[in-house]
Amino acid sequence: MAEITSAKAMARTVRVSPRKTRLVLDLIRGKKVADAIAILKFTPNKAARVIEKTLNSAIANAENNFGLEKANLVVSETFANEGPTMKRFRPRAKGSASPINKRTTHVTVVVAEK
């Protein structure tokens, strides 16, 4: 049987737009886990907080479930898919209204041994 060398964590229905989340994910993809955490700590973005929590969860999954060493882990795969959109309306002049889409994101972080 093949040995497991990767672990995954997901954050679902996060109240940040997928487009903004992808910008932060591009910063950490392919980096060592320690470097990725340092980058996220100093990124002034709402998405960075969520991604940092998800990354820490993936690291914990790797250590506890699969017995992998944190020092050997690399962020191998990250992606942000679109979650459900909350549709709202903003009242405008003359009794009309404009639609507002409050987008949500499903964030996935995969860490693997290098």
Curated annotation (Swiss-Prot):
GO terms for molecular function: rRNA binding; structural constituent of ribosome. It comes from the Bacteria. CDD domains: Ribosomal_L22. GO terms for biological process: translation. Signal peptide: none annotated. Coiled coil: none annotated. InterPro entries: Ribosomal_uL22, Ribosomal_uL22_bac/chlpt-type, Ribosomal_uL22_bac/org-type, Ribosomal_uL22_CS, Ribosomal_uL22_sf. GO terms for cellular component: cytosolic large ribosomal subunit. Keywords: Ribonucleoprotein, Ribosomal protein, RNA-binding, rRNA-binding. Part of the 50S ribosomal subunit. Belongs to the universal ribosomal protein uL22 family. This protein binds specifically to 23S rRNA; its binding is stimulated by other ribosomal proteins, e.g. L4, L17, and L20. It is important during the early stages of 50S assembly. It makes multiple contacts with different domains of the 23S rRNA in the assembled 50S subunit and ribosome. PANTHER family: CHLOROPLAST 50S RIBOSOMAL PROTEIN L22-RELATED (PTHR13501), LARGE RIBOSOMAL SUBUNIT PROTEIN UL22M (PTHR13501:SF8). This is Large ribosomal subunit protein uL22. The gene is rplV.
